[in-house]
Amino acid sequence: MAKKIDAYIKLQVKAGQANPSPPVGPALGQRGVNIMEFCKAFNAQTQGLEPGLPIPVVITVYSDRSFTFITKTPPASILLKKAAGITSGSATPNTNKVGKVTRAQLEEIAKTKMPDLTAADLDAAVRSIAGSARSMGLEVEGV
C-alpha cells in the first residue's frame, strides 16, 4: 500500500549549499522531517551543478515523517540574467532595455529548461524563453 502524503513543500535552495538555516530548517522542521538527511541528499544530488545556482525543489512529506524530493531546473530568469551578464531585469521593460541575448543563448537555456517546460519542441521552448527575456527588459536577437 502506498504511503499517505502529509504535505508538499516547495523551496528554492542553492545548489550544493543546503543547510539547516532558514528557509530549509523551519520549513522541514515543522513537518518533523530529518533536516540533515535532506541537506545531505540534496547536496549530493546537486553537486554536479554550478554552486550557488538556485534550484527549485518539491519535497513530498509522508505521514511516517519520511520524505522524497524532486529537483527542477533553475528558473529561466536566473539563466537569462547570467547569459546577458546583468544583475537584475529592467523596472520598465518596454522602454528601458538592460541587455541582449542571442538565439544561440536562448536555445541553450531552452535545452536546459526543456524537462520542466510544456513546449512541444525546441522552437516553441525558445519562443517561451524569449518572451520571458522580453518581459525582463532584454533585447532578443534572431527570434
Curated annotation (Swiss-Prot):
The keyword S-adenosyl-L-methionine does not apply. One or more lysine residues are methylated. GO terms for biological process: translation. InterPro entries: Ribosomal_uL11, Ribosomal_uL11_bac-typ, Ribosomal_uL11_C, Ribosomal_uL11_C_sf, Ribosomal_uL11_CS, Ribosomal_uL11_N, Ribosomal_uL11_N_sf. SUPFAM superfamilies: Ribosomal L11/L12e N-terminal domain, Ribosomal protein L11, C-terminal domain. Gene3D superfamilies: Ribosomal protein L11, C-terminal domain, Ribosomal protein L11/L12, N-terminal domain. Pfam families: Ribosomal_L11, Ribosomal_L11_N. Belongs to the universal ribosomal protein uL11 family. Part of the ribosomal stalk of the 50S ribosomal subunit. Interacts with L10 and the large rRNA to form the base of the stalk. L10 forms an elongated spine to which L12 dimers bind in a sequential fashion forming a multimeric L10(L12)X complex. This is Large ribosomal subunit protein uL11. It comes from Thioalkalivibrio sulfidiphilus (strain HL-EbGR7).
